[in-house]
């Protein structure tokens, strides 16, 4: 959900973005030195792909992984697998939330929310059809009992509640669990809807042959459906449940579900209940439109909601303030025509034929805090992607004897998290519920996945890490203790030269990275998990017996405080090696293209590799997180990357290909390659020197890279440029102008291509410059854009495109853009035709420029701008009728007419005329460029 906004947008915070009736208090001065971040578990072996946490009364933590693994980490940092559930794991499904029963001290009951396997087919559900029964599944809330040793008692399982699920199609199936002071269970559920064919607006596709997963009216806006909701129930001793009084719909109300406490949510991935007040705090992810469209609806924004009583929060009809500017239009996906705005104030009308609930919905409530979109973000929130995680409210207990409990000054603060932006913000809540001061919390990590306060008043944080659907070395569980200037415990860091192999297995252990906050000398103690130990800082150990060993390093400071770290060693089985032969890491791709893949797996213990157990998954990368879209099993195969119809054309999106294999001994290895889009915003650089992002309304994504001086640079990785023949950059200059250069390896590496940037007449006046590329290495590395020129400011860079030459342009039904009969006369018809590899289908595409075949240009007849004006072949003349711009949604737009290249009548027959038409984002306007 990333959209970068100009600084002016943030200035609208108090006036437009917060629902506040009183002036906010001053932010509390949180001294980082008063808090200690303790690493409890880290890495895939200890947290897997981390999903959710719940703290037990003894301050140990239960945490889930999507693959069905439930782990427990005690206060000393010892982690064990306590249970494993069989789960359905297509797209985002798997094991999600975990909750601890308020009576755990006596009943030892916990709750898990997950996707049971059922008999769902493998692979993707079709986008169109008539029978969806095979893909109808559930996400399930079940209750379990933990044994005395904290292992999961599978025989105790009681299924409490099923939530419908449309399987084989992404997204929004998460669920979070919490309890109020009365023991009522709250469960948040996503809308279970696909956002990738709605142009970043509301997914309300009512075409009768469409997969129901494209219509969120059947779920979030359906009063008779449990998706897109916050549910509130009271679970009975036997596992059945009752509905407490005061939910949104009274029991017995026709066409409603009494379990619904609040409705109208898109992806309420994290929520918590403040037990002192019963108020629910919730983060709801929003869609990704980069700009408001009067015919569709508002630009994408996200919300933190403060739910004080039952209500409707509007999705998929209303968002943010629910004013007209932030309300969606009715939209006919079949015809691409707009309708009236939904009535958020009076209550939207759900007319979808898939709606089984009330037609007239309750009035929509505004967000407590909404950010991004046209309103910008609170200045304290900074910039980046939008991924709100609803954390806990801290309640100070003066009578609690705990040396690590948080201070009274944070009493009543809501701890908001941001996965993509990577922050934790304590927010003061006024007596009237208004938003007060927003403070910064001193955490060091990657992506906030979940948070919870423990019984001792410490804060626990689950860090997703930097992987895509697999966890990585940065995935972790942390505890934050408040020490108020006291001596802080040391941090232990443990690593091993190898973590798996056959006996005898010699492992070199290292304590490198261990430290003491006060700088004291540390002593070390290693427990090798087999009854032996060592006091050396970096010992070596040989294991002779097969098994899995949990190795613990304890670091001790001069005052006797300790920190621990763990490493898992598997003897008797070696983790498989998974190599992706293709696609190459860093190679370029186009949305809509079919990408062949090849995987080689080797494993010392598996005599032969079962290719049916090898899986390649396509993940749509999006800033620092991703959406798992589809997968294929096999050592070879192909995956078609769908045209992205959700994110703004200037969004930081890319493709991740994840190959995985689990060997016969249960060890899994993932290998990932990142594929890059041909067109990229300059401000999405990985590293840079000397430059600044600058907000500009004329820029494609609202920002450029500016303040460029001689010798400055920006860098992107990974990139493989061996097939790149030229580049085009969108630039402006009110300064000296200069030269833009492409290099690899380093900012001073060999220049592969360059383009002269002229003075354009102003910093807001953009033009395209093009350079030829040659000599690129046939390897993956870092791409550098370096800047050269005279003294002072040179130019700004908005975006750049890497061009790979000529090839077919593939459109509707997999057919090609074709010059009729291969003719070269001016006026020759441009048509859709079965792809045949002839010169009549070999197009050279210049970004924001001409599209050429047979030595002539794709032309709008007569320079016309009206709907239905035919496309033809014509002598290249540099006119606006021959200028074409590729959009991220797959459309090819003619800027002069502001219309898109379109297959007339949406008819895939050979010979169908190509013309221009209003840009609708429909299938007959989507093209895969070479």
Features from the language model and the residues they span:
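Secretory targeting and sorting signals
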Residues: 1-27
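Extracellular glycan-recognition/adhesion modules and their associated mucin-like linkers
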Residues: 805-824, 839-865, 882-908, 926-930
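Solvent-exposed loop segments of extracellular immunoglobulin-like
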Residues: 517-524, 608-616
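Acidic, Ser/Thr
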Residues: 510-518, 598-606, 732, 820-822, ...
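Beta-propeller domain segments
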Residues: 30, 93-95, 103-105, 117-118, ...
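Extracytoplasmic
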Residues: 502-507, 538, 552-554, 559, ...
């Amino acid at each position: 959900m990333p959209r970068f906004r100009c600084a002016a947008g943030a200035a609208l915070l108090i006036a437009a973005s917060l629902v506040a009736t009183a002036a906010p208090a001053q932010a509390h001065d949180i001294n980082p030195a008063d808090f200690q971040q303790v690493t409890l578990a880290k890495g895939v072996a200890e947290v897997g792909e981390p999903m959710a946490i719940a703290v037990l009364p003894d301050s140990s933590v239960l945490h889930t992984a999507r693959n069905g693994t439930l782990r427990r980490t005690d206060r000393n940092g010892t982690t064990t697998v306590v249970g494993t559930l069989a789960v359905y794991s297509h797209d985002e499904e798997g094991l999600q939330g975990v909750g601890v029963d308020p009576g755990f001290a006596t009943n030892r009951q916990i709750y898990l929310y997950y996707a049971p396997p059922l008999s769902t087919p493998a692979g993707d559900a079709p986008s169109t059809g008539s029978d969806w029964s095979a893909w109808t599944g559930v996400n399930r809330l079940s209750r379990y009992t933990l044994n005395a040793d904290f292992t999961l008692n599978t025989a105790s399982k009681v299924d409490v509640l099923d939530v419908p699920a449309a399987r084989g199609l992404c997204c929004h199936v998460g669920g979070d669990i919490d309890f109020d002071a009365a023991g009522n269970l709250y469960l948040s559920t996503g809308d279970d809807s696909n956002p990738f064919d709605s142009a970043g607006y509301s997914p309300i596709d009512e075409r009768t042959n469409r997969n129901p997963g494209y219509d969120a009216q059947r779920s979030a806006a359906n009063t008779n459906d449990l998706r897109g909701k916050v549910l509130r129930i009271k679970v009975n001793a036997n596992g059945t449940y009752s509905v407490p009084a005061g939910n949104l719909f009274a029991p017995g109300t026709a066409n409603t579900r009494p379990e619904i406490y609040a409705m109208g949510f898109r992806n309420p991935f994290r929520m918590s209940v403040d037990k002192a007040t019963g108020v629910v705090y919730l983060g709801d992810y929003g869609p990704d439109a980069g700009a408001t469209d009067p015919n569709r609806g508002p630009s994408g924004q996200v919300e933190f909601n403060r739910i004080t009583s039952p209500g409707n929060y509007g999705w998929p009809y209303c968002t943010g303030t629910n004013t007209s500017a932030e309300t969606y239009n009715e939209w006919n996906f079949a015809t691409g025509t707009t309708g009236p705005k939904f009535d958020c104030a009076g209550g939207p009308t759900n007319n979808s034929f898939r709606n089984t609930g009330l037609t007239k919905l309750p009035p929509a409530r505004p967000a407590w805090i909404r950010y991004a979109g046209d309103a910008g973000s609170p200045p304290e929130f900074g910039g980046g992607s939008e991924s709100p995680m609803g954390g806990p409210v801290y309640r100070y207990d003066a009578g609690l004897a705990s040396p690590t409990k948080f201070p009274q000054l944070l009493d009543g603060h809501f701890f908001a998290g941001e996965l993509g932006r990577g922050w934790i913000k304590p927010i003061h809540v006024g007596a009237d519920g208004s938003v007060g001061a927003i403070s910064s919390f001193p955490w060091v990590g990657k992506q906030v996945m979940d948070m919870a306060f423990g019984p001792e008043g410490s804060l626990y944080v689950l860090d997703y890490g930097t992987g895509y659907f697999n966890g990585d070395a940065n995935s972790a569980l942390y505890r934050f203790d408040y020490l108020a200037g006291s001596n802080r415990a040391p941090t232990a860091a443990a690593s091993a030269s190898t973590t798996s192999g056959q006996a005898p297995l010699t492992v070199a252990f290292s304590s490198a990275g261990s430290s003491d906050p006060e700088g004291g000398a540390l002593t070390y103690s290693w427990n090798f998990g087999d009854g032996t130990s060592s006091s050396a800082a970096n010992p070596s150990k040989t294991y002779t017996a097969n098994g899995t060993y949990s190795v613990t390093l304890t670091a001790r400071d001069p005052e006797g405080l300790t920190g621990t770290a763990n490493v898992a060693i598997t003897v008797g089985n070696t983790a498989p090696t998974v190599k992706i032969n293709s696609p190459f890491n860093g190679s370029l791709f186009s949305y809509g293209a079919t990408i062949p893949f090849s995987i080689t797996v080797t494993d010392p213990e598996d005599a032969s590799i079962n290719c049916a157990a090898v899986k390649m998954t396509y993940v749509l990368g999006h800033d620092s997180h991703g959406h798992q879209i589809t997968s294929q099993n096999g050592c070879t195969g192909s995956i078609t990357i769908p045209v992205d119809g959700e994110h703004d054309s200037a969004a930081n999106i890319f493709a991740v290909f994840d190959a995985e294999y689990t060997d016969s001994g249960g060890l899994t290895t993932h290998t990932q390659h990142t594929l890059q889009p041909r067109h990229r915003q300059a401000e999405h650089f990985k590293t840079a020197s000397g430059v600044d992002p600058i907000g500009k309304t004329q820029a494609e994504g609202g920002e450029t890279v500016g303040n460029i001086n001689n010798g400055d640079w920006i860098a992107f990785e990974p990139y493989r440029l061996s097939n790149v023949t030229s580049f085009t950059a969108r630039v402006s200059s009110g300064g000296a102008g200069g030269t833009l250069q492409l290099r690899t390896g380093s900012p001073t590496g060999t220049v592969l291509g360059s383009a002269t940037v002229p003075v354009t007449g102003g910093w807001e006046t953009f033009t395209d410059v093009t350079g030829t590329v040659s000599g690129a290495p046939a390897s993956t590395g870092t791409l550098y854009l370096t800047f050269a020129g005279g003294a002072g400011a040179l130019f700004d860079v908005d975006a750049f495109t890497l061009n790979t030459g000529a090839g077919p342009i593939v459109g509707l039904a997999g057919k090609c853009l074709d010059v009729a009969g291969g003719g070269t006369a001016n006026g020759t018809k441009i048509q859709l035709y079965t792809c045949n590899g002839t010169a009549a289908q070999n197009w050279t595409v210049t970004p924001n420029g001409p599209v050429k075949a047979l030595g002539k240009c794709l032309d709008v007849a007569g320079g016309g701008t009206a709907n239905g004006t035919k496309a033809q072949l014509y002598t290249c003349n540099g006119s606006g009728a021959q200028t074409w711009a590729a959009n991220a949604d797959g459309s090819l737009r003619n800027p002069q007419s502001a219309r898109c290249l379109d297959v007339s009548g949406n008819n895939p027959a050979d010979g169908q005329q190509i013309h221009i038409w209003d840009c609708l984002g429909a299938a007959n306007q989507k093209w895969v460029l070479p």
